[in-house]
Each structure stands twice: as C-alpha cells, then as structure tokens.
C-alpha cells in the first residue's frame, strides 16, 4: 500500500486553487484535435467534489442555450491547464444536486461576502 501512495504523490498537482461547492470556476482544458491543440474554457458552478488524492474529481454545471451541461473533471488531470476561481458561493451543502431542478433566478447562488 505504501508503494501506491508514493506513486500517487508523484502525480499530484500543486497549482490547484482552493475551491468548493458553490464556487464559480473557469476550467481551462487542453483539447487536442489531430496535430493541433487549443485551450477551451468551461465556466460554471461547482456542484460537488468527491474522492481524495489522485482520484479526486469535481463536477461543474453551467446552462448553455437553456440546456444544463455538467462536466466532471479529475482535479489532478494533466488535461486541465489551470483552474481559475471567479466567485465564491455562499452555500450550506457539500453537494448542490438540487440545482438540476431549478430554473432562472432560483438557480442563482449568493456570493460570499468577504
């Protein structure tokens, strides 16, 4: 078991900002199309984080053209260029799955005041 821990530690990224459910983030994803690569930005609300270590993932939700889109990203994935926290959300839950059923202003999250 200790051998796996040392392998996992080598794969961990150190440039991950502190974010949690309710925060609005921009995830800059490296997309490879043939021989070219480009960066695509996915901005949305983090609705949950799960796992720990190398296996940790987070789910980001946004509404695009009146259709809800959710993407799950591994936190320590080499495909992610960087993560940028846009706003901090003031929520009382670790998983915000109830946002899937809400529309319009009801799906808005209050911004945390510093």
UniProtKB/Swiss-Prot annotation:
GO terms for cellular component: cytosolic large ribosomal subunit. Pfam families: Ribosomal_L19. GO terms for molecular function: structural constituent of ribosome. GO terms for biological process: translation. InterPro entries: Ribosomal_bL19, Ribosomal_bL19_CS, Ribosomal_bL19_sf, Translation_prot_SH3-like_sf. SUPFAM superfamilies: Translation proteins SH3-like domain. The keyword Ribonucleoprotein applies. Keywords: Ribonucleoprotein, Ribosomal protein. Belongs to the bacterial ribosomal protein bL19 family. This protein is located at the 30S-50S ribosomal subunit interface and may play a role in the structure and function of the aminoacyl-tRNA binding site. PANTHER family: LARGE RIBOSOMAL SUBUNIT PROTEIN BL19M, RIBOSOMAL PROTEIN L19. This is Large ribosomal subunit protein bL19. It comes from Clavibacter sepedonicus (Clavibacter michiganensis subsp. sepedonicus).
